[in-house]
C-alpha cells in the first residue's frame, strides 16, 4: 500500500529524511507521526516504500551519487525542486523497483544531474499539468545491454530542457496530444560499446522539439540508435544529423510493420562521420502523400541511405548535396520535386518525378519498378542500362531522352509526350 511521506531536515545527520505520516482512524486516538527510517537523498542503495510528494518541497542534492529502488510520485499539483549545485554532474540511479513518476505536478532540477536507469528503473511524465524542468538532462541507461529501464512522456506531460537532453535508454516513448520534450539540443547515442540500443517512438500527437539540433548516433558507437515518428507524432529542429548505426524512421523502423506517418520538420538532414556507413532514413508508412521538406545532405561522399519500404513519400527539399544510395522496395514509392543529388537508385517500386517546370535527372537508376513522369519536362540523362521496369509519362508531362541508355530496357506508357533528342544513330526497340 502506498504511504504519503514528508521531507524533514535531520540536524544530527545533516541531511534530508523522509518521514511517513501514519494516521490512525481509531476513535479517541490522535494521529501520530512515525519516523520510518532515514531515507536520505544522500545515501547510496537505500531502501524504502514508495514515496508520494503531494505538497511543495525543495531538496539539495549534493555532490555524491545516489541510488534509489523505490518510486517517487509527484502528484496533487505539488512542486518538487531539486537543487544540484555541484558541477561534477552527480548521478541519480533509478534502480529496479525505482523511478521518478510525475503524474500531476512539477519537478524543477536546478543544475546538472544525470539520471541513470538500472534494471527496470524509469522516468515518467504523464498527464496534462505534469512537467519536468531542467538546465541539462542526461538520461542514460546503466551500460548493461539487457536493462529494461524506460523513459515515457504521455497524455499531455512535458519536459523542458534549457540546453541538452541526452537520451540513451533502452526504450523511450513520447505519445499523446500535448506531450512534449523541448530542448536546445536533443541527443540520442552512446560512446563506443557503452550502453545498449536506444529506441524512441514519437507518436499520436507527441512532439520532440529542439531549438538547435537533433543528433542521432555517436561516431564510433557499436549499438543502434532509432528514432521513429509515427501516427501524427512530430519532431522539429533546424538540423537533424545521423551518425553511426542510426535510423530516422517515418512510420516504423525497418523490419517492422508499416504505420501511419508522423511529421519530420527540419531545414536540413545530414549524414555525418565518414568512417562508418550504417546510417539511414527509413520510409515505412501507410500514407499516400507524406512529405519531407528538409534538404538532405551527405557530409562526406557516399554517406547515407534512403530506404522507401512502404507508402508514398515526397522529398521536396534541395538534395543536391546527397551522394548516398536510394532503395525503393516493391510497396514503396518515392517522389522527387527538385533533385536527389548524385545518388544511385535501386527502384523496385515507384519513382515519381514531379517538376514544376523542368528537371534534369542524371541519377543512375536500376531495378524493375516504375519511373513515373508526373508533371513538367523531365530529361532523363543518366546511365539506366540496368533498369528494366516501366516508364509512365502522365498527360501533360514530357519525358526527354537523348541516348538509349537513358531508358535502359524499360517499357513505355506515354499519355503525355516522349521527346527524343538523338545526336547519333541508335535503335529504339523499347515497347
Predicted feature locations:
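Extracellular "spike/adhesin" assembly and maturation modules
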Residues: 2-28
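Short, Lys/Arg-enriched charge-dense amphipathic segments
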Residues: 29-30, 260
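Extended active-site and interfacial segments that coordinate phosphate-rich ligands
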Residues: 32-34
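Beta-strand-rich extracellular passenger or scaffold domains
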Residues: 47-431
Amino acid at each position: 500500500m502506498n504511504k504519503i511521506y514528508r521531507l524533514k531536515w535531520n540536524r544530527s545527520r545533516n541531511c534530508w529524511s523522509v518521514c511517513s505520516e501514519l494516521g490512525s482512524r481509531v476513535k479517541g486516538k490522535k494521529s501520530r507521526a512515525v519516523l520510518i527510517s532515514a531515507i536520505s537523498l544522500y545515501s547510496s542503495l537505500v531502501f524504502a516504500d514508495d514515496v508520494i510528494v503531494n505538497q511543495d518541497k525543495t531538496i539539495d542534492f549534493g555532490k555524491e551519487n545516489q541510488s534509489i529502488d523505490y518510486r517517487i510520485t509527484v502528484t496533487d499539483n505539488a512542486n518538487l525542486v531539486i537543487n544540484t549545485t555541484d558541477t561534477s554532474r552527480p548521478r541519480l540511479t533509478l534502480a529496479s523497483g525505482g523511478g521518478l513518476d510525475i503524474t500531476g505536478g512539477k519537478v524543477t532540477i536546478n543544475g546538472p544531474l544525470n539520471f541513470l536507469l538500472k534494471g527496470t528503473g524509469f522516468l515518467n511524465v504523464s498527464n496534462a499539468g505534469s512537467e519536468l524542468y531542467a538546465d541539462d538532462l542526461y538520461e542514460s541507461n546503466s551500460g548493461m545491454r539487457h536493462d529494461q529501464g524506460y523513459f515515457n512522456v504521455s497524455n499531455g506531460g512535458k519536459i523542458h530542457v534549457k540546453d541538452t537532453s541526452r537520451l540513451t535508454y533502452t526504450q523511450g516513448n513520447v505519445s499523446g496530444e500535448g506531450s512534449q520534450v523541448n530542448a536546445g539540443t536533443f541527443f540520442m547515442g552512446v560512446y563506443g560499446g557503452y550502453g545498449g540500443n536506444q529506441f524512441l517512438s514519437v507518436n499520436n500527437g507527441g512532439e520532440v522539439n529542439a531549438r538547435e539540433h537533433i543528433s542521432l548516433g555517436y561516431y564510433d558507437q557499436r549499438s543502434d540508435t532509432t528514432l521513429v515518428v509515427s501516427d501524427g507524432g512530430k519532431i522539429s529542429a533546424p538540423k537533424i544529423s545521423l551518425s553511426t548505426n542510426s535510423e530516422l524512421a517515418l512510420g516504423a523502423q525497418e523490419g517492422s510493420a508499416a504505420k501511419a506517418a508522423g511529421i519530420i520538420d527540419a531545414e536540413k538532414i545530414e549524414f555525418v562521420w565518414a568512417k562508418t556507413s550504417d546510417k539511414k532514413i527509413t520510409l515505412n508508412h501507410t500514407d499516400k502523400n507524406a512529405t519531407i521538406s528538409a534538404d538532405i545532405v551527405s557530409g562526406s561522399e557516399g554517406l547515407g541511405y534512403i530506404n522507401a519500404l512502404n507508402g508514398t513519400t515526397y522529398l521536396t527539399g534541395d538534395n543536391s548535396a546527397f551522394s548516398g544510395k536510394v532503395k525503393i522496395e516493391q510497396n514503396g514509392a518515392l517522389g522527387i520535386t527538385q533533385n536527389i543529388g548524385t545518388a544511385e537508385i535501386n527502384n523496385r517500386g515507384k519513382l515519381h518525378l514531379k517538376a514544376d517546370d523542368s528537371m534534369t535527372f542524371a541519377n543512375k537508376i536500376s531495378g524493375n519498378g516504375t519511373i513515373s513522369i508526373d508533371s513538367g519536362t523531365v530529361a532523363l540523362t543518366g546511365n539506366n542500362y540496368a533498369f528494366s521496369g516501366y516508364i509512365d509519362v502522365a498527360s501533360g508531362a514530357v519525358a526527354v531522352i537523348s541516348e538509349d541508355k537513358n531508358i535502359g530496357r524499360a517499357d513505355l506508357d506515354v499519355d503525355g509526350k516522349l521527346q527524343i533528342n538523338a545526336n547519333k544513330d541508335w535503335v529504339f526497340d523499347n515497347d
